Amino acid sequence: MVAGCVVALLATAAGPAQALDNLPPKQPLVQDLRTENSPCATGDDPTYVSQPPRLSAVLYDPEEDNQPVEANLVKGEFEAWWTDGAGVEQRRTHTTLVSLSGTPRYWTVPDDIPANTVVSWHVRADDDEATSSWSDEGDGSACSFVYDDVSPEKPTISSPEYPEPEDVFWVDGVGVYGHFTMDSPSEDVVSYRYEFPGSPPRTAPVEQPGGPATISYLPLTSGPKWLRVRAVDRSGRWSAESEYEFNVQSGRAPVARWRLDDPAGSRSATAETGTAARAGTGVTFGGPAPSGTGATATVGLDGSGHGFLTTDAPATDIRKSFAVSGWARPAETGRNMTVASQDADGGPGFALGLRNGETGPAWSFAIGDATVSGGAPETGEWAHLLGLYDAETGRARLYVNGHEVGTEVAATPAEAAGAFQIGRARGAVGYRDRWHGDIGDVRVHDRVVVPDEVTELARRKPKLLGRWALENATDGTSPEQSGGAPLRLGAGASIHRGSDDSCIPELDPDCPYVPPALVGNGHLALDGETGYAAADGPVVDTTESFTLGVVVRLTDSALDRPMTVLSQAGEHTDVFKVRYDPSTHSWQLVMPEKDEAGAPEKVVAQIKSAEGGQKRRLAVVQDDGTDTITLFLDGSVKATASLPRGLRSTGALQIGRAGAGGGWGEYFHGDVDEVQAYSGALRERDVPFLGTGVDYCPC
């Protein structure tokens, strides 16, 4: 019995002896130490800080010595030291609270640390039973910082291209780069924080501490401008702000421009600026101009060796920034053709035109060995082309109909001091890639043409085709406001007139209430069964850009079927229709894939909208330049679809019904007002003015 007790006692005593003794925390690693947000600085390059910094260290305690469910806790012991002005070493210490192993510990050093003095620090871990080695022992290193309590001085700002107004009041100009040098007298400045109007703040580094920094700026608009700058020193301190003002003129005119609107029979093209261009015998003056551009005529080139115009002199130095642009309408797209180029040795210095690749024809701008391509040329269709080389960035871009296409590329132009060409490009022997088609208004700028200018150059101003205010009707027709063709009203259509204000229902119980018109004094009321209005023929050319606007209100309390408000047919089916579909609670733009009997319809754009008798303003904008069609609701909400080429419409514009099975259907039950039609695509900013009851000019 006694022996058994002894054995049990010995077994109990042996349990704790098998547990591991406490292991000391691990030595902190330099890569786990930070001064503020900067890594530990070792050696002779301390971190500069603008205030007494917060130091941090991630500390670890081994887990091998843990008891079951024991938390692995550790605290940090920080120590900082420096030599004061009397040569005496000063030290400050701090012990943190305990925290879990692997988490950072912090110490914000006291405010009595001296400025402009190297302060060193190290740290060790403590688990209340043992401490680690200091972080600078063995292979470790001490960290160091310098507290900088003085901000840098304000910088001066200068620019050779854009002097201040007291020197030159207005300076040329939009599309011309300016270079601004910022320089602070402080020797520890490492960067400059700067801001131009309309742009976010940016940082420009210096090449060496205390040096200047030069930035470039491309004005995109004219008017008064400013540059605000602060110097930033190595501690992160900012100087007071310096402001530099300058005034930017509008972009200067082209260095060369040929309107190409000379009279038929001319043998040369007059230059508005630059050198006149002599024409080959394959050039015909007096051709048609793209509508809505202000151009009155163009030239036709027959694609032969005689179809060209040349100045016999360069138009610009293509080693500097330049842009070349013009209107072009190809008579074919199956081969390479050049709109404009400038001769270099054995080839063109640049070439703007049409190129054929594996995916088919595309517009192209080539300069040196670089080419950017995009867009889809179509036979017989006008396009505005602009090729741009930006010497500041060394990049080339291509714009088609005011929109950038393709991907900009790095380009290195060769010297091209040869003649400027319209309709051909230099080859190894003679000329090649001759243009077959029409060309108009060719321009060459010796600067960057900025995006807003590109858009304006390519803009084709819409033309009002008709506005039907639907205020009244005589003999079943409602007039167009400018005396154009009226709309014919069907049996279930009538003009509702709002109150004439001859009496006031709120004051006179015998005065009947008359609902107000949607817009103005009247609107078209449709019964949803036979009611409609129609023009005598197609109002918009659906193969070109167009805009339609209308104001509507659904009055059917039980919407159980689609209802069409606008449609225009081809030979066999509606080329487009705008309708409300209650099953999807959306306004829809519907188009067929083909103009064939029974062709399936496709909803190309739709906008969700729960309808409860509200007035709605709808618009359809087809932009042939971008191959898109857009449905707008209330001037702002939109849905856009790609439309490579619209089907041709031959049927009359219908208000309130759509074609169905050889007859009519989808009759609209509600009110319609302010039908407006334009040739050309209204800009998005113009669409909200549709349906307001005024003759809007998208000028």
Which residues does each predicted region cover?
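Short, aromatic/His-centered strand-loop micro-motif at the edge of beta-sheets
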Residues: 362-384, 589-617, 662
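Localized edge beta-strand/strand-to-loop motifs within extracellular or lumenal beta-rich domains
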Residues: 381-395, 614-628
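Extracytoplasmic low-complexity segments
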Residues: 61-68, 85, 211-219, 224-226, ...
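Extracellular glycan-recognition modules
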Residues: 252-255, 305-362, 395, 448-454, ...
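Flexible glycan-contacting loops in extracellular carbohydrate-active proteins
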Residues: 357-361, 408-438, 641-672
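Low-complexity, disordered linker/stalk regions enriched in Pro/Thr/Ser/Gly
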Residues: 8-13, 17-256, 286-312, 323
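Extracellular beta-strand elements of beta-rich domains used
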Residues: 326, 385, 439-444, 450, ...
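Short, conserved beta-strand segments of beta-strand-rich sandwich/propeller modules, principally
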Residues: 118-122, 224-228, 323, 384, ...
